[in-house]
From Swiss-Prot:
InterPro entries according to UniProt: N-reg_PII-like_a/b, Unchr_N-regulatory-PII-rel
Pfam families in alphabetical order: Nit_Regul_Hom (PF10126)
Record-given protein name: Uncharacterized protein MTH_1110
Similarity comment: To M.jannaschii MJ1244 and MJ1245.
Species the sequence originates in: Methanothermobacter thermautotrophicus (strain ATCC 29096 / DSM 1053 / JCM 10044 / NBRC 100330 / Delta H)
């Protein structure tokens, strides 16, 4: 199979006769497929969400910066993992629930960034190598479009 993902258009034009012998497509169809695929690769964005414990914030920020992430936002929260939560029964009054969170929840951070899709795998690999003994959760959410209103 021929992959045209990172092939410059000039090289693609030279490859068209070889591709045509394999597929029954016309040159303009090959160019259209190639151009469309390239645009999808360039424009695909992912909302990357990383849940970590506070003490790992500096390490995670360094990993993201090293891997090409140029900006992110951070949300501080208190969290309880499902294994810690198992077996708890919470009274439904707000004071009991808040008391439980204060007593058992851990300080944690959610780091979010919109990144190009090709940055995600290297980031995940770095987490696997450098934070193997730490708790973290990574969520990748594909972005269909971004609308910015800045009057």
């Amino acid at each position: 199979m021929i992959h045209l993902q990172h092939t410059p258009p000039a090289v693609t034009a030279l490859m068209i006769p070889a591709v045509l012998s394999c597929w029954s497509l016309h040159p303009h169809q090959i160019y259209y497929l190639h151009s469309t695929y390239l645009c999808m690769v360039i424009l695909m964005k992912v909302h990357l969400r990383v849940f970590i414990e506070v003490e790992n914030l500096g390490r995670v920020m360094n990993i993201l910066a090293d891997e090409g992430v140029t900006g992110f936002y951070i949300v501080e929260y208190k969290g309880v993992s499902p294994t810690e939560w198992k077996g708890f029964s919470v009274k439904e009054d707000p004071e009991s629930a808040i008391s439980l969170i204060h007593d058992y929840a851990r300080d944690a951070v959610l780091i979010c960034s919109v990144v190009d899709e090709e940055l995600v795998e290297p980031i995940v690999n770095r987490f696997g190598e450098e934070l193997a003994s730490e708790k973290y959760t990574i969520i990748e959410i594909p972005i269909r479009r971004i609308i910015v209103n800045s009057p």
